[in-house]
Amino acid sequence: MDKMQPISQALYSLLFLGCMGAGFPLYVQGQNVDELPPDSIYNIGYARGSLKNISGSVEQITEKQMNRELITNPLEAIQGRVPGLTILKSNNGMAALESVRLRGTTSLTSGNDPLIIVDGVLGDLTMLTSVYPTDIESFTILKDASETAQYGSRGASGVINIVTKKGRAGKTRVNYNGSFGVSHAYRRLDMLSGAEYRKLAAERGWSILDKGYDTDFQKAIEQTGLQQNHNIAFYGGGEASNYRVSLGFQNREGVIQNEGMKLFTANMNMSQKMLDGLIDCELGLFGSMKRDRTLFDLQKTFYSAAAFNPTFPDFPDPETGSWDQITTASQITNPLAWMDVDNREETSYFSSHARLTFNLLKDLKMVLFGSYTYSTTENAQFLPTTVWANGQAYRGNRKSEALLGNLMLT
């Protein structure tokens, strides 16, 4: 119970130059630690702790405290909720994050992003796209060295621990969560139209290449992007076991033509008590498939859209299929030509983990944890001859695997 208790013999005094001083009793607000709610238990990584025994800086964001707007990455659910957490999204505004800072810049040569943990599986920012935001039960943020020390140098920039939802006892239930939205450019640069460009050139006596059209290239490359999120979950269980399975889909269309993202996610959690509660077994799987299509040259596309000759047409040559270009300005190209470039990235991610908890004594447990993670990324680019002098094509892929295991007595 919260109580306001006056401190004996304590006065808070205010004295202003040339004015009469004033004093009043000083009050402090206290709370009995033993009266903290039972849900104040934090998952700090390899172990669990409560407000009574955690000495470092730890913050927990539950589902009720998360942001509710359309989000593409789980960390957006806690943006603005955690002091000191800075999130920088990628230029295309899709699911990927460019950087995340929790404890500021801690290294000039190594990475400064915090360590990401999902249900005990260690990873980086790329792992976040495999977790659908509504599948998350809570975030626990570790900032202090006393709590991140358990992860060694990997936790030097802080730790963000994500716990996904689990099944509950009862009949099988189905839950659906969906949302829709649109995105568009808020405003454009105020540039000369084709008619204004001709008029100004005539007044100044300039010699210009006039194709006879009036094209707003900023508007020509834009589109109204549709956004949609869908997630369906099945969960249930009994006294000794429970399960939860969910499937998610996100579709994002950018405000520029040919920009977009499709993301498919899957998550499964199962738990089983064995030998009359002597052993607790937990199994989990989560994974995703993401397809991105982005601009090949973001800076040149937007710069050209603002600076390109507005008297040029907004369609290619009917005979050759090529776009009209300005040959005297190497950094200004027809922005619509860049819409023909195919720049794709496909990423697949899969992770499985298992945890066995042996309840040896009342206050002694042995926990055995293991995880396997696999990811693959494929990049592909194609620049047709109508855009690039001799055309260009590229394809590359990379993959990674990781095994993690630990044994702990607690």
What function would you assign to each model-found segment?
Residues 1-268, 273-274, 279-286, 349-351:
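Short, small/polar-rich motifs associated with maturation and membrane association
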Residues 23, 62, 218, 337-341, ...:
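Short coil/turn segments at secondary-structure junctions
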Residues 26, 84, 311-314, 357:
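Hydrophobic residues in alpha-helical membrane-spanning segments
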Residues 32, 168-213, 255-256, 265, ...:
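Surface-exposed loop/interface segments of Gram-negative outer-membrane beta-barrel transport/assembly proteins
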Residues 78, 83, 307-311, 362:
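Proline-centered flexible-loop/turn and helix-kink motifs
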Residues 261, 270, 347, 356-364:
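A conserved hydrophobic secondary-structure block that centers on an alpha-helix together
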